[in-house]
């Protein structure tokens, strides 16, 4: 399986994402600079955290118009798995691949710590290695992670089981404690916590590694060649 890590000016979690795939998961991965125009040939696309374009205007709003994003959107609409973490989640929101928006954390402070998440839906491309209702520990590091959407959108997200991860505590003010959501097709996941920072016991745990293992497992199952 071949992964692409999209690198924007100001990305600072791209190396962590690369390490998670190459060293922890053991799969092939390339960096793709934001000026590239094609993601053809990649089986999964990863948008890392950071401060793309300095977070000017608002987080993710400029990165959304990078040349590479047109093809990321095309690939997502064709079913290619796309994972956006932290700033990557914000870019997915700005690109319209996921509903809603991000606000400043309710206490207007930058939050950087491990948090507990409850797995709300383990029947997705990204969560099949988890147990339904399981509590996992994944670090967060953000100042604008307060997920917001209108009441109707929230109702649809909950009804369609699109809420994948939920904070077990009030971390940043997100509606319904939402930490991560998928699109209706289930192939695009945005989440504020950083699974790529939880792939080794050496740095605090491996709860994030199972997300990448889920991607690999489901890709392999969908590419089984039968005689």
UniProtKB/Swiss-Prot annotation:
Catalytic activities: N(2)-formyl-N(1)-(5-phospho-beta-D-ribosyl)glycinamide + L-glutamine + ATP + H2O = 2-formamido-N(1)-(5-O-phospho-beta-D-ribosyl)acetamidine + L-glutamate + ADP + phosphate + H(+); L-glutamine + H2O = L-glutamate + NH4(+)
Domain Glutamine amidotransferase type-1: 3-225
Protein location: Cytoplasm
Source organism (scientific name): Halalkalibacterium halodurans (strain ATCC BAA-125 / DSM 18197 / FERM 7344 / JCM 9153 / C-125)
EC numbers on record: 6.3.5.3, 3.5.1.2
Pathway terms, separated by semicolons: Purine metabolism; IMP biosynthesis via de novo pathway; 5-amino-1-(5-phospho-D-ribosyl)imidazole from N(2)-formyl-N(1)-(5-phospho-D-ribosyl)glycinamide: step 1/2
Gene expressing this chain: purQ
GO CC annotation: cytoplasm
Keywords on record: ATP-binding, Cytoplasm, Glutamine amidotransferase, Hydrolase, Ligase, Nucleotide-binding, Purine biosynthesis
Protein name from the UniProt record: Phosphoribosylformylglycinamidine synthase subunit PurQ
Function, as annotated: Part of the phosphoribosylformylglycinamidine synthase complex involved in the purines biosynthetic pathway. Catalyzes the ATP-dependent conversion of formylglycinamide ribonucleotide (FGAR) and glutamine to yield formylglycinamidine ribonucleotide (FGAM) and glutamate. The FGAM synthase complex is composed of three subunits. PurQ produces an ammonia molecule by converting glutamine to glutamate. PurL transfers the ammonia molecule to FGAR to form FGAM in an ATP-dependent manner.
Signal peptide: none
Lineage per the UniProt record: Bacteria, Bacillati, Bacillota, Bacilli, Bacillales
NCBIfam families per record: FGAM_synth_I, PRK03619.1
Active-site residues annotated for this sequence: 86 (nucleophile), 194, 196
GO molecular function: ATP binding; glutaminase activity; phosphoribosylformylglycinamidine synthase activity
One of the GO BP terms on file: 'de novo' IMP biosynthetic process
Listed Pfam families: GATase_5
Assembly notes: Part of the FGAM synthase complex composed of 1 PurL, 1 PurQ and 2 PurS subunits.
Highest taxon of the lineage: Bacteria
PROSITE patterns xref list: GATASE_TYPE_1 (PS51273)
């Amino acid at each position: 399986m071949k992964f692409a890590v999209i690198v924007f000016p100001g990305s600072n979690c791209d190396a962590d994402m690369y390490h998670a795939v190459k060293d922890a998961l053991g799969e092939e991965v390339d960096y793709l600079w934001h000026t590239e125009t094609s993601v053809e040939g990649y089986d999964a696309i990863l948008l890392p955290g950071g401060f793309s374009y300095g977070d000017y205007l608002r987080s993710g709003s400029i990165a959304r118009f990078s040349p590479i994003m047109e093809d990321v959107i095309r690939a997502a609409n064709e079913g290619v798995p796309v994972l956006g973490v932290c700033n990557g989640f914000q870019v997915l929101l700005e690109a319209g691949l996921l509903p809603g928006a991000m606000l400043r954390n309710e206490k207007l402070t930058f939050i950087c710590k491990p948090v507990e998440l409850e797995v709300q839906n383990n029947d997705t491309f990204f969560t099949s290695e988890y147990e339904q209702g399981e509590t996992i520990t994944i670090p967060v590091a953000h100042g604008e992670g307060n997920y917001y959407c209108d009441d109707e959108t929230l109702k649809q997200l909950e009804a369609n089981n699109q809420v994948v991860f939920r904070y077990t505590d009030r971390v940043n003010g997100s509606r319904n404690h939402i930490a991560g959501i998928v699109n209706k097709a289930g192939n695009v996941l945005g989440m504020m916590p950083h699974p790529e920072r939880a792939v080794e016991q050496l740095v605090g745990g491996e709860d994030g590694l199972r997300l990448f293992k889920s991607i690999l497992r489901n890709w392999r199952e969908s590419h089984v060649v039968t005689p």
